[in-house]
A protein has these predicted regions:
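Non-catalytic ligand/cofactor/substrate-binding and regulatory segments of enzyme domains
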Residues: 2-131
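Activation targets extended, charge/polar-rich intrinsically disordered C-terminal tails
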Residues: 119-188
Length: 188
């Protein structure tokens, strides 16, 4: 008799499974609704409760209805390493806060985008004061120079991203789904 589940514990498990399936469906729908060939700055909260202006920064480039490419740097204690590659799970990432659309990249320029994203992989730890945010801003400057992102002031874009991150961090901590997608007002 000790192995029999109590009815309320069964209900909790069933509700948790249903909630998990609902979240998965919402995430898949959100991914499919992203416009193709769009580039995003992606912010993740680093703590719960979230702290203001404290995010992990990365890029996401949406190429198909089922996914795209992630570009970001990870700190392994002794330095930063690239963590780029295909993903179908941008909305499934733990602590995802917000996606901020910054550009549409036409298909003929996809290779240039990928090369630019990887352009500092070999010397990332030589970027002064490198963090994921500083790497992202360094790459952003190159994306602007390449004409892939049209933004007049990358510092104001960083501030705008912080504002969006702070706005949505509490709902990220409570795992409200799907996570918001916004468009930068500073990028053309």
């Amino acid at each position: 008799m000790g192995n029999l589940a109590k009815p309320d514990s069964v209900a909790r498990v069933t509700n948790a499974r249903q909630r998990g399936l609902e979240i998965k469906k919402l995430q898949e729908e959100a991914l499919a609704q992203l416009p193709l060939n769009t580039l995003y700055i992606v912010l993740y909260i680093r703590s719960d409760p979230p702290r203001a202006n404290d995010f992990h920064w990365g890029y996401y480039f949406h190429q198909t209805t089922s996914g795209g490419s992630k570009y970001h740097m990870r700190n392994l204690g002794g330095g930063w390493i690239p963590d780029h590659g295909p993903t179908s799970g941008v909305f499934k990432s733990n602590f995802l806060c917000v996606l901020i659309q910054i550009a549409n990249v036409p298909e003929p320029k996809h290779a240039i985008l990928d090369q630019t994203m990887r352009s500092r992989d070999d010397d990332v730890n030589q970027i002064p004061g490198v963090t994921c945010r500083i790497w992202l801003m360094t790459i952003l400057q190159r994306l602007i120079e390449e004409g892939l992102v049209r933004c007049d002031d990358h510092q104001k874009l960083q501030d705008e991203c912080m504002m969006f991150g702070n706005q949505y961090s509490a709902t990220a901590a409570s795992n409200s789904q799907p996570r918001p997608v916004v468009r930068s007002k500073l990028c053309k």
